C-alpha cells in the first residue's frame, strides 16, 4: 500500500505539473520506478521515466567544481573513519597524476594510512591537496564528461525522484548542469534539504508531511535495486560510464529482497486489475495508506524482523563497514525510545492498564531479582519503608524483643528525618 501511495502521488503530481521526464535516482529509486511503470497502464500521459546510476560516492567528483569545494567533503564523509589514501580514492580525478602524492604528503607530515583524528587534520590534508596536487585542467575535463553523461537524462522539463533526505546530490547536479532539478522525496530528516534546494534553486516536493521515526536502512533496503552500487564514473574514455562495485548480496539476501518486492508489485498490479481507471479517483490520505508500512518499521515483532536478519547494510561513507540490518533496526528503536504499537494498545486497554503502584512494584521486582538479603534491606530502608515494616512483621512478628530493638532505632531515625524536613 505504501509503495502504491508513493507512486500514485508521484505520477499524478508530475502529470499535473507537466514534466517531460522523471529520473529515478540511486538504488532506492528502483522499486518506486517499477511501481510507476505499472501505473502508466492507467495514466497514459505520464512523463517518461528513466533510471540514473548515482550514489553519494559517485557524486563526490561531480561536487568538486573548484579547489575550494574540497573542504566541503567533510559534510559527506565521516572523516574520523578515513585515511588520506581512502579519501584520495574518491578525488583522484582532480589530482595531478604526474606528481608523487605520498611523497608530497609525507613532506607535510601527513601519513597515507593514518586515520584523521579531527576536522583540523582533515582540512590540513585538503589544504595540501588544493595547493600542491590539484589539477584544474584535469578536473574540468572530468567534469565535462560527467556533465555530458548527466545531460542525456535531464532533457526537456525534468524532475528527480529519490527516497530522501538531504537534497545534496540534487544540489550538486543542479549546479553542475546549471538547471533547476525539481525533486520528489518520500521524506526529509532535517531542514538542510530546504537549504540545499534554495542553493540549487529547485522545488522540493515531499510525500510525508512529517518526519517518520525510522529513516534509512530498512526503509531504503526494501525499495532498492539489488544490483551492484554505482561507485563512480570512468572518464578515461571519450564518454563517461558508471563504475560498479562487486555485488554485496548472496543468494539468501537476494531471495529475501526479491520476494518482498515481488509481493509489493503484485499488489499494485492487482489494484490496477480490480479498479482500472477508477484508481485516478481513489480517495485516501497519504498518512493512512502508508500506516501499515510504518507500523511494520516501528512495531515489527522479533520474528518478523528475522526475515531480514541475513542482510547487511553497506555504508562506507558514514560507518566504514557493513552492519546487520536488524541490529541497525533495533538500535534505532532504542535510540528513539519507541514503544511498539501493541505495547501502547496493551497499556491503554482496560484489562491491562496498570496503576502507578503496580508499575512501581513491577520495577522493584526487576531491580531486586536475585539480590542478596543485605542489598534488599538497604533498598527498602532507603526507598520503601512500608515494605520494610511489612517484611519485618512477617519475619520477626513473633519475636517481641527483636521487634522492640529494631523499632527504637527506626523511630529515632524517623524523628530525625522529620526534624530535618521541618516537621514536628
Segments predicted by a language model, with ranges:
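Long, low-complexity, Lys/Arg-enriched
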Residues: 1-424
Amino acid at each position: 500500500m505504501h509503495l502504491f501511495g508513493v507512486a500514485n502521488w508521484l505520477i499524478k503530481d508530475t502529470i499535473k505539473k507537466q514534466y517531460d521526464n522523471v529520473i529515478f535516482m540511486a538504488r532506492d529509486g528502483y522499486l518506486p520506478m517499477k511501481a510507476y511503470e505499472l501505473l502508466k497502464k492507467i495514466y497514459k500521459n505520464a512523463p517518461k521515466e528513466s533510471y540514473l546510476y548515482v550514489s553519494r560516492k559517485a557524486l563526490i567528483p561531480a561536487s568538486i567544481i573548484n579547489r575550494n569545494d574540497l573542504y566541503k567533503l567533510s559534510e559527506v564523509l565521516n572523516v574520523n573513519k578515513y585515511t588520506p589514501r581512502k579519501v584520495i580514492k574518491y578525488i583522484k580525478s582532480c589530482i595531478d597524476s604526474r606528481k608523487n602524492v605520498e611523497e608530497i604528503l609525507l613532506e607535510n607530515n601527513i601519513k597515507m594510512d593514518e586515520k584523521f583524528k579531527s576536522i583540523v587534520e582533515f582540512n590540513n590534508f585538503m589544504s595540501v591537496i588544493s595547493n600542491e596536487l590539484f589539477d584544474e585542467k584535469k578536473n574540468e575535463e572530468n567534469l565535462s564528461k560527467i556533465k555530458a553523461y548527466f545531460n542525456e537524462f535531464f532533457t526537456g522539463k525534468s524532475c528527480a525522484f529519490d527516497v530522501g533526505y538531504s537534497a545534496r546530490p540534487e544540489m550538486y547536479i543542479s549546479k553542475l548542469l546549471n538547471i533547476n532539478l525539481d525533486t520528489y522525496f518520500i521524506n526529509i530528516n532535517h531542514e538542510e534539504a530546504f537549504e540545499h534546494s534554495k542553493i540549487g534553486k529547485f522545488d522540493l516536493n515531499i510525500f510525508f508531511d512529517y518526519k517518520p521515526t525510522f529513516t534509512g536502512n530498512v526503509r531504503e533496503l526494501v525499495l532498492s535495486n539489488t544490483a551492484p552500487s554505482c561507485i563512480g564514473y570512468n572518464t578515461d574514455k571519450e564518454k563517461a560510464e558508471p563504475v560498479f562495485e562487486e555485488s554485496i548480496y548472496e543468494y539468501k539476501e537476494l531471495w529475501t529482497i526479491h520476494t518482498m518486492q515481488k509481493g509489493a508489485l503484485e499488489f499494485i498490479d492487482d489494484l490496477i486489475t480490480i479498479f482500472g481507471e477508477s484508481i485516478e479517483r481513489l480517495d485516501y490520505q497519504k498518512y493512512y495508506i502508508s500506516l501499515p508500512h510504518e507500523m511494520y518499521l516501528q512495531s515489527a515483532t522479533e520474528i518478523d524482523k528475522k526475515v531480514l536478519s541475513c542482510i547487511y547494510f553497506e555504508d562506507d561513507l558514514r560507518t566504514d563497514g557493513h552492519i546487520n540490518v536488524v541490529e541497525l533496526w533495533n538500535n534505532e528503536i532504542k535510540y528513539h525510545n519507541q514503544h511498539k504499537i501493541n505495547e501502547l494498545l496493551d497499556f491503554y486497554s482496560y484489562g491491562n492498564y496498570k496503576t502507578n503502584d503496580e508499575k512501581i512494584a513491577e520495577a522493584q521486582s526487576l531491580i531486586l531479582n536475585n539480590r542478596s538479603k543485605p542489598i534488599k534491606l538497604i533498598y527498602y530502608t532507603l526507598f520503601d519503608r512500608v515494605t520494610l515494616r511489612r517484611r519485618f512483621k512477617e519475619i520477626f512478628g513473633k519475636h517481641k524483643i527483636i521487634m522492640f530493638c529494631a523499632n527504637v532505632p527506626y523511630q529515632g531515625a524517623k524523628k530525625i528525618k522529620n526534624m530535618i524536613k521541618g516537621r514536628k
